């Protein structure tokens, strides 16, 4: 028997699974020093959706976030989730970008890289594995666990051997959908220990409730590490609560040795954050228990709910949950993990909301079916392949998708121009060019940091004062971490230290949080200054010829007139288009969804400006049919 080690997932997978990755770094920093004292094997703090979500929704720089976390956790290794050739994005990147990103992540604070490929295609692990071994960081190779007619224990062991051959230091079983059961866990852990011989790390989502029993069986079978979250961010779609697992193993041969009282202090803090921001606890409902049917992972579930609400279609969740297994079977049973969870989930949403199965297909789904994400685990439905690809050729089986991506760092740096002031800025642009452009333009500055001090008297006593040493400490936090603003309240006075010229995130004082929260929420929800007003749904129009066709948006999202910022528009007024020709892109649910002409026509009106938000049914174009 050996002590079971714990990796904490609260500030990465916990919040991604329950809070749609909307936790601000200011909510994290006050508690990190206590988390650093727990004795975790590692704190998972970065990667997954915690790179693009802060950039996209919170106006935060993910690199600054990582540096700030590292500053407050000097004693505990920081871990990240890396999507192999996809890094923290949603498609393949070139070998050079992969190597530079891994080195930058390590340089900024990452000690443990958990690497997975959504298809368990070992080819998509090679570049990141080589880069990690160069840095000297720990390389944890992850198996995406799922249940399907084409996934077997032998497949998983063969894949684990491939990870070992690439230099993996540990093997993780990544049960992102909560599909593992106690006896499946026992068999898989034993097989990995006996046949691969590396330390085994088990990652389960609570979902249907079996995860704690899985962890007990995993420990008994020889697993060394499991993943948990602090109770306020545990259960439901997230991981089991650390307090539960630590208590369960007390006085056993697997006793973690972790102080429960310290864990409860940390949990009290996270519960305050949850209440202050009006966020939900993790719960297991009937739809969660049905995971053994729909196989939807925790993070995917919370995002699906959020996305359907954005589409004003929250009542269609049951329909989407029934559609997901159908789509998954038609495209070869990919494990539902990023980016495949987004690709399959979005296709299911589009099938349901449009009323036409496979009528609207995101470009990412088309690329997957063509083989550009890697090899599908099982056979694809021929009728779907024909409908989606048409005349587009599929990739030959012996071609490695990653070798087709040749974008260089210098090319990205040239595109970013003087908006990028560091390698990290360029890498951010390489992964998310539109979001990076918006963020870097807004925060453009090359001046030496100066500090501004704001003071607001809130007290009731005339003799209340603020300790000057505390102000010095606030300045030190801003200076050392790169965070733009820190606010605390003490002795009836609220003090804010702000880096001049920066618009960043604040650490809310507990007493001032209720007052500050609505403003913060409004700021997070507001569109960028450059964005136009959201286009309204189409209304009947008798001013145009009766034969003109109104093309409307099939979803809520952002309208893009061109495939990339520097490319020409798909169409212009007066252009003739044929059936199936792309008219524009609607970015929604992190995917690019092409809107196509349904018949030969002439473009008579373009109704929107580029990058304008749209609602479901918003007018995009008027087309005049061409009759022979």
Report each predicted region and the residues it spans.
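Active-site beta->alpha loop and helix N-cap motifs at the rims of alpha/beta catalytic domains
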Residues: 47-159, 164, 178-182
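Conserved, mostly hydrophobic/aromatic
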Residues: 14, 35, 115, 171, ...
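Hydrophobic faces of well-ordered beta-strands that scaffold small-molecule active sites
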Residues: 6-9, 41-45, 76-83, 113-114, ...
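Catalytic cores of alpha/beta
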Residues: 154-159, 208-221
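Terminal or standalone catalytic/regulatory effector modules within metabolic enzymes
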Residues: 36-54, 285-291, 295, 299-466
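Structured functional modules or segments
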Residues: 521-628
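Acidic, compositionally biased tether/linker regions
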Residues: 445-552
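Active-site mouth loops of central-metabolism enzymes
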Residues: 10-30, 81-97, 116-119, 142-155, ...
């Amino acid at each position: 028997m050996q002590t079971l080690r714990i990796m904490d997932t609260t500030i990465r997978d916990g919040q991604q699974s329950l809070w749609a990755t909307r936790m601000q770094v200011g909510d994290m920093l006050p508690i990190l020093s206590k988390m650093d004292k727990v004795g975790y094997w590692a704190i998972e703090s970065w990667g997954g959706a915690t790179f693009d979500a802060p950039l996209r929704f919170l106006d935060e720089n993910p690199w600054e976030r990582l540096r700030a976390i590292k500053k407050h956790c000097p004693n505990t290794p920081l871990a990240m989730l890396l999507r192999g050739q996809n890094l923290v994005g949603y498609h393949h990147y070139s070998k050079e970008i992969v190597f530079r990103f891994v080195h930058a992540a390590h340089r900024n604070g990452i000690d443990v890289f958990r690497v997975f490929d959504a298809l368990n295609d070992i080819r998509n692990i090679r570049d990141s594995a080589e880069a990690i071994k160069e840095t000297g960081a720990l390389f944890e190779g992850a198996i995406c666990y799922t249940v399907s007619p084409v996934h077997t224990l032998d497949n998983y062991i063969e894949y684990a051997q491939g990870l070992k051959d690439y230099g993996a230091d540990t093997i993780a079983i990544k049960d992102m959908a909560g599909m593992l059961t106690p006896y499946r866990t026992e068999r898989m852990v034993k097989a990995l220990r006996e046949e691969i011989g590396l330390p085994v790390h088990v990652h389960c989502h609570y979902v249907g409730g079996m995860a704690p029993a899985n962890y007990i069986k995993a420990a008994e079978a020889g697993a060394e590490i499991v993943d948990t979250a602090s109770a306020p961010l545990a259960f439901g779609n997230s991981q089991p609560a650390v307090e539960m697992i630590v208590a369960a193993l007390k006085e056993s041969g697997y006793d973690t040795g972790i102080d429960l009282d310290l864990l409860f202090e940390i949990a009290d803090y996270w519960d305050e954050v949850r209440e202050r921001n009006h966020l939900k606890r993790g719960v297991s409902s009937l739809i969660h228990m049905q995971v053994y049917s729909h196989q939807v992972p925790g993070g995917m579930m919370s995002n699906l709910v959020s996305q359907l609400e954005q589409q004003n279609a929250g009542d269609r969740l049951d329909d989407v949950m029934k559609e997901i297994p159908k789509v998954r079977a038609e495209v070869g049973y990919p494990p539902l993990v990023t980016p495949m969870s987004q690709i399959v989930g979005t296709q299911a949403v589009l099938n349901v909301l449009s009323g036409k199965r496979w009528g609207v297909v995101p470009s990412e789904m088309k690329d997957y079916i063509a083989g550009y994400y890697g090899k599908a685990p099982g056979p694809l439905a021929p009728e779907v392949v024909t409908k989606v690809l048409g005349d587009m050729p599929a990739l030959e089986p012996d071609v490695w998708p990653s070798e087709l991506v040749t974008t260089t760092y210098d090319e990205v740096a040239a595109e970013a121009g003087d908006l990028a002031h560091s390698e990290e800025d360029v890498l951010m642009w390489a992964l998310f060019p539109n979001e990076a452009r918006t963020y870097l333009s807004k925060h453009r500055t090359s001046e030496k940091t100066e500090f501004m001090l704001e003071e607001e008297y809130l007290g009731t006593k005339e003799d209340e004062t603020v300790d000057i040493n505390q102000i010095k400490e606030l300045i030190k936090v801003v200076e050392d971490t790169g965070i733009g603003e820190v606010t605390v309240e003490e002795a009836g006075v609220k003090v804010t230290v702000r880096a001049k010229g920066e618009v960043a995130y604040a650490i809310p004082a507990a007493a001032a949080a209720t007052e500050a929260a609505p403003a913060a929420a409004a700021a997070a929800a507001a569109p960028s200054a450059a964005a136009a007003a959201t286009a309204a749904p189409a209304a009947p129009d008798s001013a145009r010829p009766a034969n003109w066709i109104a093309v409307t948006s099939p979803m809520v999202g952002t309208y893009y007139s061109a495939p990339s910022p520097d490319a020409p528009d798909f169409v212009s007024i007066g252009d003739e288009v044929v059936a199936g020709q792309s008219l524009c892109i609607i970015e929604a649910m992190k995917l690019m969804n092409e809107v196509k002409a349904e018949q030969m026509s002439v473009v008579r009106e373009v109704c929107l400006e580029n990058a304008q938000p749209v609602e479901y049914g918003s007018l995009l174009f008027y087309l005049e049919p061409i009759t022979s």
